[in-house]
Structure formats: structure tokens, C-alpha cells
């Protein structure tokens, strides 16, 4: 705010490697911090210790990474500044640095890039999502993050492709970080490409991914995030139930799974399950009882209303049967009722003890190989025969 030394009326912020950006409510941009490559966009390479107003106007989003920044206007144009030796600014050349904001070019280099609705920056590459739901990328590609099937670095935008070599379409949102690229489609499928040394591509391996490849998940994905590190990278996604899955580098506990050790297999750190009012049900033989399970969200980030479609299964129908949520004791002993919701991939169980009806057991005699066991009507057990193993 003028004269106070404080910024106000800010609607969005962004952090690069060592640089900060703030967008005001009217679309102006202030930036400050490390500026060796001109990533602040004020016409010089002097590091700024206080916010400086830039020439940008009508800005709705800024994405910044280690040494470059990309700004998106309300009308879908893209401005870039900073490091460009790998072509990440998409201006048709590899000029080492750009100190003033200038417009990104279209893939054919015949005009400025237009009709963009989201931008994302990795360490040395940039992704853009257009209004027609297609994705383009430019910049460093040695680890295949441009998803064009090559390792050729580009200085102009190029369409990103899926594993069938088709240009990816129907895209809802994009994310870039380090040497990785991620997209989520309108039907909540997650695709990834790029460097995969710690399994950060969610593919259950550590092989680099050359084209956007679908990630196998049980239900739809809502959001994706990854650390900005190009090497020791950790990634996470949130599914439609709000459950969080993490993968990748874990040298300092980044995965949140209570372990120290990296993993290329996604792990849920959300304790989502089906729980019953009573985890242990005691019933008598010949009687019934009801169980009333509920969905326990555990640690989640999205509080969506969940429609549960439960299925019940007795693991030993000689002891107890189940119909809907009603358990019937048919034998004597202990079993479990498995509760599942295959739509949302959540599960639970209830332990069931079936006791003697009215204290009167049904007499029964059973035989082993060399010994016998008898259950008397008073509920006592008698044994006889070979006892070499304490049977």
C-alpha cells in the first residue's frame, strides 16, 4: 500500500526458486528476490530486497520455478521472463536470459501464443493448457518431460502426447515441477511424464516416462502436487474421497508414511475405512443382530459427501450368515463379516462371536486321526485318545 511499505489488495502469490511474485486484485504484479537471470522482469539482473511493481497488467496467474517465470493474462496471452538457455520461455530462441517480460510465441512461431487458460513451470521447462483443452510444452527435455517421445530440447511449444502417440486432449489441469510433467483430465484421470529416478511418476518403477502415461488408480484424481526439486523429488495426489497418496523421495520423511526410505509405489497416508458401531458382535445361536457401519474419513483434504454402497460377506457361513446388515448365528464359534464398498474402494470388518443359545450347547463329537473331542450339552469339552502332541 502506498506509503506504508506493505502490499495490500493481493489476490494471488507465487514463489520461484528464490523469487516471490504477488498479483493485486486489479491484475498488477509485484516481484522481488533473486534476479540474476532477469526473472523478476524489470529490465535488469539486480536482486530486489523489496517488492517492485512490474509492467504486467491484467494478470490472473503466475507460475515460477528456479530461474524463470510465466504470467498468464485474463485474455489468455502469456508473458515470460528469466533464464532461457534451454528454451523454456518458448520465444523461438535460446537467449540466455530475458530481463523484460515478453510474449511467448505459438508453436509455429507465426504469432504470439493465445487462448491459454493455465500455465505451469518445471525447473527448465514450461507447460501451457489451452482453452480447447490441449497441452503444449517447451524447454529442457533430456529426461523426457516434454512428452513428445524424444529427448530433444525445444524453444517453441510442442504438443504433448500420450502413450499411444496421440496429442493429449480433454485436459482439466496441469502441473510441472523439477523434471516432471503431470496432467489431470476432465474425467479425473492422472497422466505423467519425465524423470523418474525415485518413482515420482506414480508408475511403480524408476524408469523415465517418455510420453504422458495414465496412472493406475482405484478412483478419480482431484489434485496433483510435486516438490520443485529436480532430483530428490516427492509427488502426491488427492483422490475424489480426499485421500492423499505420496510417492518418490523420502530422505527426510517427505512421504508422511512414518518411514525413512524412498518408494516408487504410491502409499495412502489417509486412514479411510468402514467402521461399525460395535467392532465385536456377540450373538447367540439361532438369533440375529444388526450392524451399522459408517465411513471413517481419517486424514483427508477434501470433505466430499460420499455415497456408500456396502456389500456384506461372512467368512464362515457355518458360524454366521449375513443378509444386508443383519447377522444370523447358525453355528458356534468366531468369524468375521467383511464389509466392502467396491465403488469407493473402502473396506472394513466386524468380528462375530456366536455363543450357545440359552447356555445349552448342541452335543457334538468330532474325531482327529487318533483322538476324539466331544461337546456336551452343558457346554463342556471332553477329549480322549492319543496325546503325543497335547491334542
Where are these regions (language model features)?
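Tandem repeat domain/solenoid detector
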Residues: 11-14, 24-30, 37, 57-63, ...
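An edge-strand/N-cap motif at the start of beta-rich repeat modules
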Residues: 192, 236, 243-247, 260, ...
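Short coil/turn segments at the loop-to-beta-strand junctions that recur within blades
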Residues: 46, 57-59, 96, 108-110, ...
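Short glycine/serine- and acidic-residue-enriched loop/turn motifs that recur at repeat junctions
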Residues: 1-3, 30-50, 79-104, 136-158, ...
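Extracytoplasmic soluble-region selector
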Residues: 271-362
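Conserved core positions of repeat-based scaffolds
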Residues: 19-22, 31, 68-71, 80, ...
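Short glycine-/Asp-/Thr-/Trp-enriched loop segments that recur within the blades
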Residues: 4-8, 62, 110-114, 165-169
